[in-house]
Amino acid sequence: MVEGAEKVATELIGRLEQAWNEADGRAFGEPFSADADFVDIRGEHHSGQEAIAAGHQAIFDSIYRDSSVDYELIQARELWSDVILAHATGVLRVPSGPLAGEHSAMQSLVLLRGGDGWKIAGFHNTLVASH
């Protein structure tokens, strides 16, 4: 039984938010497992913690320079004793450039507990449709 699935998910999402807002790709990649899968907002698949960290540093240095994000956990539930499925929403604020503006997205995360604690094994980011 996972104790506090919401607490685990909130902590990991909070680390992502802090790393994004500090424009720190290395710190953004840290909560991910070494073999994590990340599907970005454009549907591109990134494999592994190093690729996730490097890819985020690249966007922090270019199209998302000086941007900020706010994540909010929507739900988290235990699938197995060492597996949590979580959903969050995020609001990205980009001050300038070709992607300037506010963008809302929903994230699905698979969290795994291993020898080094809880890590993000899967992350899928999807734009929220505007109505």
Question: Which positions does each model-derived feature cover?
Answer:
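Short helix-adjacent coil turns
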Residues: 16, 23-24
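A short hydrophobic beta-strand element
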Residues: 81-92
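Beta-strand elements of well-folded, non-transmembrane domains
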Residues: 92-96, 111
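A solvent-exposed, acidic/Ser-Thr-rich amphipathic alpha-helical stretch
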Residues: 6, 12, 25-82, 99-102
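A detector for short, charged/polar N-terminal pre-domain segments
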Residues: 1-5
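Short beta-strand edge/turn micro-motifs at domain boundaries
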Residues: 104-131
